[in-house]
Design a protein with these regions (language model features):
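Sequence-pattern detector for short linear motifs
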Residues: 119, 165, 180-182, 190, ...
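Residues marking helix boundaries in flexible regions
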Residues: 96, 100, 182-185, 200
């Protein structure tokens, strides 16, 4: 069952932006049927496996199955900006945040867990490949149905789905440690020019 706030039960005409927000919100809550209910994170440090996936899939579904085909543009101007702003604060944290007790969870229902995590998932789609990404997600859901999962479980199913590509998602620093889900602040690229005028990243 999904409940909805009164603010989304419109009694008069609303702006297209507000109607789109309702669609994304309803789809976000429906996504929790899979990401949160069907498969639940093992511990709160992986809260993003619920919230980032719900944010990502709700935006994807809005863009591909509703009249709001520019939902990713809306995401970039709203949610992604929210994440970038929060990532500049002294209170920022990694997407996979250290959670020592339940009191630590309260600060993680924020732009990092929702929007930055969803942005990382969108990057993973391009990194793994769309078809292989969704094959991996399907396997992740089926392998952990009605049970718990971790980031390592997710990466293992994505790694299996992307074979025979070289390398390992589990060990690439772009994803763990100082990378996308383990780092704070947004990533910066440094460009250096050598004596021959070649640019290096």
């Amino acid at each position: 069952m999904v409940t909805i706030r009164d603010q989304y039960v419109f009694e008069s005409k609303v702006t297209d932006a507000y109607a789109e927000r309702r669609v994304v919100t309803v789809l976000h809550e429906l996504a929790h049927m899979w990401f949160g209910d069907y498969v639940t994170m093992t511990w709160w440090n992986d809260l993003w496996l619920n919230e980032s996936f719900a944010e990502f899939t709700s935006t994807l579904a809005t863009a591909e199955a509703t009249e709001w085909k520019d939902a990713w543009a809306t995401f970039s101007s709203g949610e992604k900006s929210w994440a970038l702003n929060q990532d500049q604060l002294s209170t920022t944290h990694p997407i996979v945040a250290p959670i020592n007790d339940l009191n630590d969870t309260y600060v993680n229902f924020d732009g990092i867990t929702y929007a930055k995590g969803a942005s990382v998932l969108k990057q993973l789609v391009y990194y793994v490949g769309r078809e292989k990404f969704f094959t991996g997600i399907n396997n992740y859901l089926n392998n952990h149905a009605y049970s718990n999962a971790t980031l390592a479980d997710l990466l293992a199913t994505l790694e299996e789905a992307r074979q025979p590509l070289p390398g390992s998602l589990l060990h690439e620093h772009e994803l763990l440690g100082d990378g996308l889900v383990g780092a704070v602040f947004h990533r910066l690229l440094q460009l250096l020019e050598d004596v021959d005028g070649h640019i290096h990243v």
